[in-house]
A protein has these predicted regions:
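Short acidic/polar mixed-charge low-complexity motifs
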Residues: 8, 57-61, 85-86, 103-105, ...
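A short glycine-threonine-serine/GTX helix/turn-capping micro-motif
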Residues: 39-41, 108-116
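A short local loop/turn or secondary-structure capping micro-motif enriched for an aromatic residue
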Residues: 69-73, 96-99, 115
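C-terminal helix-rich "cap/oligomerization" subdomain common to oxidoreductases
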Residues: 111, 124-164
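Short polybasic amphipathic segments
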Residues: 78, 94-104
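Hydrophobic alpha-helical segments typical of transmembrane helices
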Residues: 8, 76, 121-125, 129
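Rossmann-like dinucleotide-binding domain that binds NAD(P)(H)
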Residues: 1-62, 66-72, 140
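Active-site loop of classical SDR/Rossmann-like NAD(P)-dependent oxidoreductases
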Residues: 89-91, 112-123, 140
Length: 164
């Protein structure tokens, strides 16, 4: 919502699953972030896959996510699609920009030094304390995000689209 300039929520629909890694004894993977806590006799009651769609007053957002994806590829990105071009923002990395020039689709990939995101986050927080500026982590933004997350969980549980 922050990226969309404070877009207002209209509807959400979401599905969650706990299927791919339900049986840890038979689940095959290359690596896992919680490998050191694995308990083959434990209970897996965590959603391992999510898919959804969000409508706002400015744009729509579709998303998929999985920690157990069974495709052997780790990808974290956000695509911004528009009538003049598109951007793929790689999580905590660079981006590529697609546009049309002289009747041809062109890919541009700016090279620049990426600052430490945690340092920048800390600096923005401290500056906001001094200036009173409302940053992306201001409580109003966080509450909208929390409302969105709750609605996504509710939609998945009720298996229907929800309106705001």
């Amino acid at each position: 919502l922050y990226v969309l300039g404070g877009a207002k929520l209209k509807t959400v629909t979401c599905d969650t699953y706990n299927e791919m890694a339900k049986n840890m004894k038979d689940y095959v993977y290359k690596s896992m972030w919680a490998e050191d806590t694995k308990d083959l006799n434990g209970t897996n009651d965590v959603d391992d896959m999510v898919s959804g769609y969000i409508r706002t007053d400015k744009a729509s957002i579709s998303f998929n996510g999985a920690w157990a994806q069974n495709i052997g590829e780790d990808e974290m990105f956000v695509d911004f699609l528009g009538d003049k071009g598109g951007v793929r923002l790689h999580y905590c990395k660079d981006f590529e920009w697609w546009t049309v020039e002289d009747g041809a689709l062109m890919k541009k990939q700016p090279l620049y030094k990426i600052p430490d995101m945690y340092q920048k986050e800390d600096e923005a927080f401290l500056a906001a304390i001094e200036t009173g500026e409302h940053t992306k982590t201001h409580i109003d933004n966080i509450l909208e995000s929390a409302k969105l997350l709750q609605a996504l969980y509710d939609s998945a549980e009720q298996r229907k689209e929800l309106s705001f």
